[in-house]
Amino acid sequence: MRAVSFLLLLTPTAAMFEDQADNIDWHRQNLGRAAHALFHSENTQRLAIIATESSVLAALDLRSGSVSWRQVLPVGESVTSLQTNGKVLLSLSTTPAGAFVRLWSMRGAMLWDALLPPSAGAKEMLPPDALFAGPGVVVSWGDSVTAFDYNVGDVAWRWLASGEEVQMRRLLLVGEAEEQQLQAFGVLSSGKLLRATLSPKDGSLVTSKALGSHSASDFLPRSQMVVTLDQASVAWLKGTALLQHKVGSDVIATTQLETLLPSLGGLGAAQLLPLTLPGMLALAVPAHGDAPAATVLLSVTGGGVVVADTLQGEVQLAHALSREGKATLARIDGGTELRVMAFEPDGKASAWSEAESLPYSAAEHGALAAAWLNSYARKDGSLGHRLLLSSQDDALQLMQAAKDGGHVAWVREEGLSSVQGSVTLVPLPSLVTDADAEGPPAFAFALPGVLQGLQRRWSEATAITATDEPAPRYADAYGTRQVLLLHGGAKVFGLHTSSGELLWAHWVAPLRHGAPSPEVKEVVRMEGHKVWAIVQDEAQLRILCLDAHNGQLVSESASTGELLHVSKLRLDDGASGLLLFDASLSVSLHPDTPAMRQAVHARLDSFFFYLLFKAEAAPSLRGYSLRLAADAGKHFELAPRWALALPSDVELSSTDFPATAMVGSPVRVLGDRSVMHKYVNRNLLALGLATPQNSSDEAYVQVMLVDTVSGVVVHSARHAGCSAPLTLALAEHWLVYHYWCGNQFQYQMTATELYANNTLLDDPISLLVGGPLDYTDRANMFDAFSPAAAQPHVASQTYAFGTGVAAMAATLTAGGLTPKAVILATTAGQLVTMSKNLLDTRRPLVHPSKMSQQQKEEGLVPYAPTLGGINPLTVLTHRHTIARPAHVFTAPTTLESTSLVVGIGLDLFLTRTAPAREFDRLNDDFNHVALVGAVAFLTVATLASNWYTKRRDLVAAWK
């Protein structure tokens, strides 16, 4: 038995060295826009615990802004509340399936969770409420109040409201410690307020009473119920009336806002702010007509409602509660000034403090969206204030207020959690030596630059780069140092591809003050290091020219319309332009110059476009061409050519082959020296249709290859009994797609290869030596209208695969000569590289020992019905995980062997991969010293032997 155990331990294990990880890659954790936040201090640890709109729960180190821990909740789950008692963290979240109650340790470990089902027959469910009560956690939701055991999460008791329909809203714990009672407030369908008094020990009903007499339209109040810190009042809004219940009485007082605030407009859209203050409420009134927005503080301590203060303009309020029970209210005016109001335990409020400056820039981040206050005691006994700010661009930053201007502790660009569209890469500037403009350059002049370059290369090859040292801001010889351009929302980001460092971020402000944030639709590279950012701002279409190296705005233009599609044009002189289509199918040029119009007119018969309409009631794929406009006020217009109707009850997905990707060879050389001509059609669009997994209709997956110029369906495959999710990857002449097969309860991958029906006996040697074809030359372009274009030879093969795939892409290299690999982003958050040889449609059905010599020379792999497990050495992300992966992009470097891989989801990940090893570059651990020493030794030995030979011949001649 011991021998068997010993032999089992001798099985080979795949691994990598620790110094190999994070050497050529980086991982950026994102959280999303902050929705809730609280602060926690324990010993020397200072944390900000936040919940985001992206269903993420995380703790940030207040010193650096780094993520201490993070929990990614399921998609579609909305966190509605965060609470802590100093020892544990309580989170409440809602989904269509119910409300989740979770208890976490302050280090991010989930202690227990529970699911509360929705009320039967309820059309709309309001957010739950919870509090810590003795040895348990009490939660009110729907028509019930449930208590959970603090230690294990078991249900201790549950109280259900009887009678008419009710929605429980708030919980209060009133009374002394030994005689505490639980009061649960809800709204009945008749519009009355239900107050149920329960025992926190067993949930027994003490009293229950319906208060007030209001219309049934108040059954679901638009305003949340707000409880004052002293728990003396419960308030909510009904229309323009403020309803206030005095705890301990049966009275509901009504105050009309028009009478209380006659000078303000927009009272019908006013909202109570969720601030817990002693004897005070905060009311946010939006701008209306000429009346500006205002925030009103209402005092409710004297039995009535009195306006304590009216704050005009853009004001953000935040509150904090000290351990001694003192409340602090912070007021942020315009994002640049901070004033503080302190409350005594008896509820007495002080005046606003002297203004302190905040270094907030609205030009870089937009308006403030939310603020959270963290007050702390300074060494001199005074109070200091930190502010956690969430802005319009989703950025999260910690600021320290001070009279001398304050400072920004850190900034997290959380807009990177919602990156949209494709990525754009722009090389960094090269290091150059300014030469004398007069006279030809000389070697003596270039020698210092050459020596500096050699010294820099030597230091990069031998030195170990410090982790806190920024990556160089200049290009390298391998093309791995570039600017990675991403866009999300109204912001464009420039990241360093070597380190993930944020080089710059450009916020696009709305044209109209107070308008919704614009949306960056596309980023298109121009000539040089300039890029166009196409932005949709309400009914305006804006085109921004940005410097990709620093994010500076070079120029901006605007036009009317809603963007539908944009295409890049390249003129004969090397300049670039844009063709823009709006929702009315109108065509515009940028820049609209005579040279641009003349260039488009000269190639008018070669412009073809396709548009995929997914959001319409009847989805369709339509093809268009460009023609001269009949309207004298326009130059060009779209002409419909073909249309393909699509079903409306399926999930649509599509992908194409990048127009700039290189194809190394137009043929595939077989083992018998014959060739198969690749069907290289850059007009192909891979269109996938898949029924949802929970659909009651007949399940199927259908994949079509459509020529977007002629509208011909070149290939179509239908898989019955299969369903979504469907993921596609299209390369030069092959397609790979991944889907779920419900009949066999497994994931499957299908590979399809297309070859032209060509019988010419081309010489393989001449085809390979001739190099890659220039497909931008019209002589080498694909003719979509030829008879052979619609009749390729198709070979397909399907394999079983052991995991779900969220996205995939094929590697791209500088010349397209390197064997391809498929990059898979698994649903578990890993990036996996898979050789295309494993997905070859011509894998022979023989044992490896019986393969012919020709099959071995061709590099074929014996057939197997499954692709097997994932080799750990093929996992590019190694110890990292990409939360919710959505896209995979690849890009070439100047090295033919190497391709850049970018994984995008909630997180960002970038690495380099070499499918055929780095055959054109020395390894990083190459012994450069030994090489230089060997060359120097051989040089000295050669000179010495030459001298010795001449000396010997001279001595021999004298004899």
List each model region and its residues.
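Short beta-strand elements that form the blades of beta-propeller/WD-repeat-like
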Residues: Q45-A51, K87-T94, P135-W141, T146, ...
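A short beta-strand motif characteristic of beta-propeller blades
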Residues: D22-Q29, S66-V72, M110-P118, D154-L160, ...
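Repeated scaffold domains used in trafficking and secretory/extracellular systems
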Residues: L31-H40, V75-G86, P118-A133, G163-E176, ...
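WD40 beta-propeller blade core
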Residues: A58, R102, T146, L194-A196, ...
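Short loop/turn segments that connect beta-strands within beta-propeller blades
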Residues: L62-S64, S105-R107, Y150-V152, S199-D202, ...
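Cleavable N-terminal signal peptides of Sec/SRP-targeted secreted and luminal proteins
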Residues: R2-A15
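C-terminal scaffolding/assembly regions of large eukaryotic complex subunits
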Residues: D19-H40, Q45, L62, M399, ...
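Solenoidal tandem-repeat scaffolds enriched in leucines and small polar residues
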Residues: P128-T301, A320, K326-R331, M341
